[in-house]
Amino acid sequence: MQIIEIREPEQADFKPEQQIAVGIDFGTTNSLIAIAANRKVKVIKSIDDKELIPTTIDFTSNNFTIGNNKGLRSIKRLFGKTLKEILNTPALFSLVKDYLDVNSSELKLNFANKQLRVPEIAAEIFIYLKNQAEEQLKTNLTKAVITVPAHFNDAARGEVMLAAKIAGFEVLRLIAEPTAAAYAYGLNKNQKGCYLVYDLGGGTFDVSILNIQEGIFQVIATNGDNMLGGNDIDVVITQYLCNKFDLPNSIDTLQLAKKAKETLTYKDSFNNDNVSINKQTLEQLILPLVERTINIAQECLEQAGNPNIDGVILVGGATRTPLIKDELYKAFKIDILSDIDPDKAVVWGAALQAENLIAPHTNSLLIDVAPLSLGMELYGGIVEKIIMHNTPIPISVVKEFTTYVDNQTGIQFHILQGEREMAADCRSLARFELKGLPPMKAGYIRAEVTFSIDADGILSVSAYEKISNTSHAIEVKPNHGIDKTEIDIMLENAYKNAKIDYTTRLLQEAVIEAEAFIFSIERAIAEFTTLLSESEISIINSLLDNIKEAVHARDWILINNSIKEFKSKIKKSMDTKFNVIINDLLKGKNINQIK
């Protein structure tokens, strides 16, 4: 596979007077910042000569200290989380238990002698990265492309953008980490195909199926686990060392486990004082974790329709473990691509995209996907899906909706997220009302509704009614998002309940149709009694009773058959004039239009 040349350029490649933007990989364990010029990437080192800066923050002597592996860790896991989610998730609670303000109504941490929100704390890490880059490049930096996990929701994305804004960055684009890595690999004009991006970082695992055609990058499916990463491998090794050699479960033992893991990537054994572990033992210990990632990758392929893939792109420092490459090859029998340093692939892609956005010289395009379907609640609690699960974004979809009852002067819009067929089983994102509509017969008012997801994954919904020239728009706020765990649960529940959901929807649709049918017929009888004989009215009422009984029985097949029976018998036995009235009513026409 041919890849773009990526090298450490001379300092002269970066001129302060040029408009520049940086790429930032804000990682769970480590963060990086880089800049690209003429499609050559430079990862910017910290003042102590490190490219990988630990994503830790401490506050001592009235100063923030970044990257010293002390204080608050893995703050990235807190993006988009509510206080309730933190309290109910042991893994998250353990991260912040020493800082958490449990008396607050929202998530705040006691930090720097203040009560701070997560974006305010994370902003200090962005400030540190910004200062390091400005010192190296001798220029002010204000623009950035920032990477986020593929499964970050609106809430998390919004807080990342807020943190960067507090730090003084204009965020040009948020892009998914696997997408950024693929961008670093796939810029060659002749590159095309379908690739699986396997991203195992310190704290999260993401997998994407990426289609590359004629310079267009399209993520066609995503999956992952935001509570699985290289840190879990370290924990497994630490537990083994504690049990095998009677060591304390301490930071020192954890560091020893990390050293053993790193050594065993290129040696068959590791020996340190009275501790020893060989490659075979290591692989036995971590195989269950690796198999979990393989299963997630296979599920992602199924979501994408099982396309033929041309290679696997490795991202994340944890992928240096030889067992991962071996197991991936066993599972997929294709090339494993690891030409680029897996720790840097994401930030390289971000830097290249940043350069592309401020000085476009390529037609390459990145496309992410919506992790869950988005839609609206219809009458009767039915969900109308408007943007489907795994639809490429950015996207905008327009649909038309109408009133259900006469003289309706407002339409309630309930925005939902999820794969189930009924609103009660989906996640509520937002509600708004289009008011001031002219009172007219049901079905006359037409509201044009637009669902749009921008390149950063933020959803906005607008509605417009032409007759009254009334409009309303809403942007779904970050606190309406959901996390990766909930996404997995919702997808699993949708799969398990697919059959019952389908029949529930069919029943509800049949009931709604029957109720509208009964209303229209009874209204016609009341207004056109003179056209009917007593025997005809008796036949109509008898047939209507059959429909009502079917509705009461909650049998959608019986309901549909009862309506068909009504139409058939009325057509044969009723006066032609009344038949015209009935047909027009059932087509949604106004009685006053019937001549």
Curated annotation (Swiss-Prot):
Superkingdom of the source species: Bacteria
Matches recorded under Pfam families: HSP70
A single BP term in Gene Ontology: iron-sulfur cluster assembly
UniProt KW keywords: ATP-binding, Chaperone, Nucleotide-binding
Recorded GO MF terms: ATP binding; ATP hydrolysis activity; ATP-dependent protein folding chaperone; unfolded protein binding
InterPro entries attached to this UniProt entry: ATPase_NBD, Heat_shock_70_CS, HSP70_C_sf, HSP70_peptide-bd_sf, Hsp_70_fam, ISC_FeS_clus_asmbl_HscA
Family: Belongs to the heat shock protein 70 family.
Free-text function comment from the UniProt entry: Chaperone involved in the maturation of iron-sulfur cluster-containing proteins. Has a low intrinsic ATPase activity which is markedly stimulated by HscB.
Full protein name: Chaperone protein HscA homolog
Organism annotation: Rickettsia rickettsii (strain Sheila Smith)
Gene name of the record: hscA
